[in-house]
């Protein structure tokens, strides 16, 4: 699959993939997450703010620990557009962005923005994951493992927190379920 991506690289697609890597990476995604956490907190949706922070932060911590356990080398550097430090499995970009997309979907699901947020979150996570393969810095299994790990982590966290913070299951804006 990585050979297919390499054979279909174009300068335009490479620029898009590199931009996704930056936005979904350690410099920008945490700032986006913190901005949304702050907005939720200011809006009085403290359980939602805590959930988003724990979802993305916990996925990041889980990723670091998992990489240290498996220590899988990255794909051949000759295949890659970028050079990334550290181990390959699971993809940190895929894991953090999937956690972000799933968490904001769960937060806004009962609001009017539910479907658009769900679609945007899913599309975003898929685009970031595909970009990691396109750039040659991860195997497809790294991306899949990162996304699935985040799915299990974030949904499990949501169910657990919902037991102790029932307000988490409502809309952050206090809207009624319009479905």
Predicted segments — roles?
Residues 25, 29-36, 56, 117, ...:
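Hydrophobic alpha-helical transmembrane segments of polytopic
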Residues 1-28, 68-81:
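N-terminal transmembrane-helix/juxtamembrane module of multi-pass inner/ER membrane proteins
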Residues 79-179:
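Membrane-embedded catalytic cores of phosphoryl/pyrophosphoryl-handling enzymes
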Residues 31-33, 40-115:
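Membrane-interface loops
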Residues 3, 51-56, 124, 146-147:
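Alpha-helical transmembrane segments of multi-pass membrane proteins, especially transporters
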Residues 4, 64-65, 159:
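Membrane-interface helix caps of multi-pass small-molecule transporters
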Residues 3, 22, 39-40, 106:
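Surface-exposed charged/polar residues within alpha-helices that form helix-capping/stabilizing sites
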Residues 37-38, 130:
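Generic hydrophobic alpha-helical segments
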